[in-house]
């Protein structure tokens, strides 16, 4: 559980950022253990070289979730053929999927909304 804010100035986005950070570190661990290839994750994590590996269950779960979404997107792109497609990624945080897809596909237009 998250601790209640201790001051009136507590950052209301802190729990969201903490969740994103935890997911990014789990992804880094999964990459370092050889489950996934992702050259973009380490630069997104402060002091990545100091991060400890996550337990095997976290690595396997991160791998399965990533592969499932990647396979769905691959099928979707294949079925679309040369038609224009649109991806709306809500709450992507430090997800590197855009960069990993951009290496394989040509994006004519993209928008980032922070």
What do these predicted regions represent?
Residues 1-114:
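Rossmann-like AdoMet
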């Amino acid at each position: 559980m998250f601790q209640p804010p201790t001051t009136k100035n507590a950052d209301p986005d802190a729990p969201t950022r903490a969740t994103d950070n935890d997911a990014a570190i789990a992804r880094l661990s999964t990459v370092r253990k050889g489950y996934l290839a992702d050259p973009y994750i380490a630069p997104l994590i402060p002091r990545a070289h100091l991060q400890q590996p996550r337990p095997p269950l976290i690595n396997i779960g991160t791998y399965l979730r990533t592969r499932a979404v990647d396979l769905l997107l691959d099928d979707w792109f294949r079925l679309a053929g040369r038609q224009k497609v649109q991806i709306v990624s809500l709450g992507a945080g430090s997800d590197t999927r855009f960069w990993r897809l951009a290496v394989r596909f040509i994006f004519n237009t993209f928008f980032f909304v922070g």
